[in-house]
Amino acid sequence: MTERFQGRLADVIRRPLITEKATRALEINQYTFEVDHRAAKPDIKAAIEQLFDVKVTGISTMNPPRRSRRMGRFAGKRAQVKKAVVRLAEGNSIQLFPES
């Protein structure tokens, strides 16, 4: 685990990503999260295992390019994000949707 997130693992994970592709991946025990762009794979693994009490078997990360945004004549960039696809061990799961 890197020094940046020492003792602050809850700051690593921003939110789960719920898309059609991510929902299909739930069937094969893969969960997609938006994480801090400075987080390394060991940070993400430690945060997921500690927050959700599961065993992580693999992580794939991707850094999509920043998107430009305009507000009138002013141009800017959206915040940098990193996506992490987390594979869990057999028998583990994360409750993303409330039971109705």
UniProtKB/Swiss-Prot annotation:
<dbReference type="GO" id="GO:0019843">
    <property type="term" value="F:rRNA binding"/>
</dbReference>
<protein>
    <recommendedName>
        <fullName>Large ribosomal subunit protein uL23</fullName>
    </recommendedName>
</protein>
<keyword id="KW-0687">Ribonucleoprotein</keyword>
<dbReference type="InterPro" id="IPR001014">
    <property type="entry name" value="Ribosomal_uL23_CS"/>
</dbReference>
<dbReference type="GO" id="GO:0003735">
    <property type="term" value="F:structural constituent of ribosome"/>
</dbReference>
<dbReference type="InterPro" id="IPR012677">
    <property type="entry name" value="Nucleotide-bd_a/b_plait_sf"/>
</dbReference>
<dbReference type="InterPro" id="IPR013025">
    <property type="entry name" value="Ribosomal_uL23-like"/>
</dbReference>
<dbReference type="Pfam" id="PF00276">
    <property type="entry name" value="Ribosomal_L23"/>
</dbReference>
<dbReference type="GO" id="GO:1990904">
    <property type="term" value="C:ribonucleoprotein complex"/>
</dbReference>
<comment type="subunit">
    <text>Part of the 50S ribosomal subunit. Contacts protein L29, and trigger factor when it is bound to the ribosome.</text>
</comment>
<comment type="similarity">
    <text>Belongs to the universal ribosomal protein uL23 family.</text>
</comment>
<keyword id="KW-0694">RNA-binding</keyword>
<keyword id="KW-0699">rRNA-binding</keyword>
<keyword id="KW-0689">Ribosomal protein</keyword>
<dbReference type="InterPro" id="IPR012678">
    <property type="entry name" value="Ribosomal_uL23/eL15/eS24_sf"/>
</dbReference>
<dbReference type="GO" id="GO:0005840">
    <property type="term" value="C:ribosome"/>
</dbReference>
<comment type="function">
    <text>One of the early assembly proteins it binds 23S rRNA. One of the proteins that surrounds the polypeptide exit tunnel on the outside of the ribosome. Forms the main docking site for trigger factor binding to the ribosome.</text>
</comment>
<dbReference type="GO" id="GO:0006412">
    <property type="term" value="P:translation"/>
</dbReference>
